[in-house]
């Protein structure tokens, strides 16, 4: 059987737990110190004084310091009873007077027995006003002595409890606020690191907090600046290469237009190659631009899918739809999602047999859209590499393409905090489903097929 262990993972929870534990240990230690060095000695002194009073009340003669004995008159004894509030009860009367609700304390009985020199039973009755001590000694085994502690009130402990609770809450609240302030730079750093992972370079972070955190933030800013410079250099290089490639391609196209009619088939073949080269260059540029920050807005996913379906449908291509009826409002960059859907449809058209199905829906706080084809599919062990740049399945080796179409889709969906799933379509081909986060309150309608 697996053992369950409580182990907080975040530094916030660990630090707060450590402070609360230290505070609890400090309170327990303080309690033990006060108990052993203040309360117990006072209690022993109280027992000693109480024992003197009981001995004086239970005996007829008192021994003074010089050794002489003094006879205690009954009137003097009664006056002491009245001043101290002490009452004497038989066993039956004591039960009726509250002894039945009193609790026996062994350590008090033991200490009182030592003071009185014989067996003694001590009980404490706790009532609403003040506690009462009941004693029965060997000096008068049939009599219970009732001693009210009128100077001690139940309400006296309430301020102590409230002050202790207030101190604990203030300490925990202060610790929580301190840790939150200390961890705020780390939260900003985490958010910025996630953006860099998506290809979005945030502005330099403000360096604040502890010296170690400032050092990490400074190093992260240097790293982000280096990554941004590298991305800018790559984009500039690709733009220059594409410009330099398009110039000779344009000259080649002009040369084909000046070719004679007898070379028309050759000119047509050259023009197709030129168009393919231009398409490859455009895909390279699209891939580089995909990682840039995109402004998000609330848009209808079904409307975006409908625009792509209308643009990609043709007499040689059958696109079936199973879109959820109504509106699916998603926070997105519509142009990027449109590009992702178009790439998925083009991929299905290229490797399928003219059957494509586009569907959409919602499930568990998420919206999804899916593109299926009836092609040969792809082996399960190759699916995890399908969205990597320049990677294509075995069935696509003989077809044209750069292998960047689905890589662009992956980057777009990642920038929307979504995810991609690969499966098998209803006709045995490839199925690609994209999930996007969406509030449940913005989902309406049911699925309808066309």
Curated annotation (Swiss-Prot):
Residues 240-440 form the Histidine kinase domain. ATP binds at residues 243, 347-351, 373, 392-393, 402-406. Residues 1-15, 180-450 are cytoplasmic. Keywords: ATP-binding, Cell inner membrane, Cell membrane, Kinase, Membrane, Nucleotide-binding, Phosphoprotein, Stress response, Transferase, Transmembrane, Transmembrane helix, Two-component regulatory system. It catalyses: ATP + protein L-histidine = ADP + protein N-phospho-L-histidine. InterPro entries: 2C_sensor_his_kinase, HAMP_dom, HATPase_C_sf, His_kinase_dom, HisK_dim/P_dom, HisK_dim/P_sf, Sig_transdc_His_kin-like_C. Residues 223-289 are annotated as: Cytoplasmic dimerization domain (CDD), when dimerized forms osmosensitive core. SMART domains: HAMP (SM00304), HATPase_c (SM00387), HisKA (SM00388). It is found in: Cell inner membrane. The modification Phosphohistidine is found at residue 243. Its EC number is 2.7.13.3. Homodimer. Has several major domains; the N-terminal cytoplasmic domain is followed by 2 transmembrane helices that anchor the protein in the membrane; the periplasmic domain between the helices interacts with MrzA. The cytoplasmic C-terminal domain has a HAMP domain joined by a flexible linker to a histidine kinase domain. The HAMP domain by itself is intrinsically disordered. The cytoplasmic dimerization domain (CDD) forms an osmosensitive core and includes the autophosphorylated histidine residue. This is Sensor histidine kinase EnvZ. The lineage of its organism: Bacteria, Pseudomonadati, Pseudomonadota, Gammaproteobacteria, Enterobacterales. The gene is envZ.
